[in-house]
Amino acid sequence: MLSPRFKANGRAFAHIAGFHPELVALRRDLHAHPELGFEELYTGRRVKEALRLCGVDEIHEGIGKTGVVGVVRGRKSSSGKMIGLRADMDALTMTESNDFPWRSTKAGMMHGCGHDGHTAMLVGAARYLAETRNFDGTAVLIFQPGE
């Protein structure tokens, strides 16, 4: 059951629910293809492509070597207001022991700390913000390599 605060944002949740399966697929793909800090080449490409498909206003890559930054301007971007949202993309050097179809395909490396989920959630935020633009200011979406 959603809290009253979340119910007030029912339109946002309904909108995001429309592309939730795509976010799950992205998270599972990233989980299956973990990369260590500052080696997130595949992850960076996937993020860049997802942001392009979302329709963000700007995409900057190679930030901190493998990081990606997306920029979305709201309906009133001239206000000078700006917010940054961040997700970390790197994996850990540990062996995955589950047997899910999306388990790590790389021996001794896995997303054991949720960074695949953080990345997918920030892509979801980027898509929602780009599709609705129902905010005042600019949102900067930072996909950080090497936490």
Where are these regions (language model features)?
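Acidic/His- and Gly-rich active-site-bordering loop/insert found
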Residues: L2-H111, A120-V123, R127-G137
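Acidic, glycine-rich active-site loops and adjacent beta-strand->loop/helix elements
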Residues: M89-A91, D116, I142-E147
